[in-house]
Amino acid sequence: MERKVFSKDGKEIRTINLDDRVFNIEISHGSIYNAIKNELSNLRVGTSSTKTRSEVRGSSKKPWKQKGTGRARVGTRRNPVWIGGGIALGPKPRDYSYRLPKKVKRLAFKSVLSLRASDENNFKVIENFNIESGKTKDLALIIKNFASFNGKVVILLGNDDQMIKRAGKNIRDLKILSFDKLRVVDLFYAKNLIALESAVNKLNEFYVK
């Protein structure tokens, strides 16, 4: 699949080949769902904790005798029905993370890349560039040539360029991701995807294996 490559000024300069095995496969919505669920689950801290009836402070003495008072029978002030009692079936610290099969993860990445590449207006390939100044305004001028700021914008880099990342820190709804640190959830919810040539070449090379 051929796509136009633009300069950082927004001018068409050449074309690039997007490998059909990466950017034009049949989209597997199930694998995308499972990958996003896995990524979000792995981010959960899992520190929520409640006290059971055996852990809360208070006497374990029976408040009143079982029979003869006309009141409901109660065994302890710490029972979950009473205010200040323990919590029944409440959350405890746990690990929510789990491992997703590699084949499912690879299929999810290729599916979400194919989904984004299917919309030529919201997926742009641009020549490699540097921002030596590291200034936000310099990066913002480049982005305006390719995307509106009405939704999430993701820029894919071929390497971990700290100056470009520094320039994008103050831009709202912008994520700058290097090729080796992509997440399906970021690509899926991006309204505009801008990929540098180097990122496309590395994606072609990595996911064709």
Curated annotation (Swiss-Prot):
Per the database entry, which stretches of residues form a coiled coil? none
One Gene Ontology term of the biological-process aspect is: translation
Q: Which GO terms describe its molecular function?
A: rRNA binding; structural constituent of ribosome
Q: Where along the chain is composition biased (Basic residues)? A: 59-71
Region: Disordered; residue ranges are 46-71
Query: What are the annotated GO cellular component locations?
Result: ribonucleoprotein complex; ribosome
Q: State its role.
A: One of the primary rRNA binding proteins, this protein initially binds near the 5'-end of the 23S rRNA. It is important during the early stages of 50S assembly. It makes multiple contacts with different domains of the 23S rRNA in the assembled 50S subunit and ribosome. Forms part of the polypeptide exit tunnel.
The family assignment reads: Belongs to the universal ribosomal protein uL4 family.
Its subunit composition reads:
Part of the 50S ribosomal subunit.
Q: What is this protein called?
A: Large ribosomal subunit protein uL4
Q: Which gene encodes it?
A: rplD
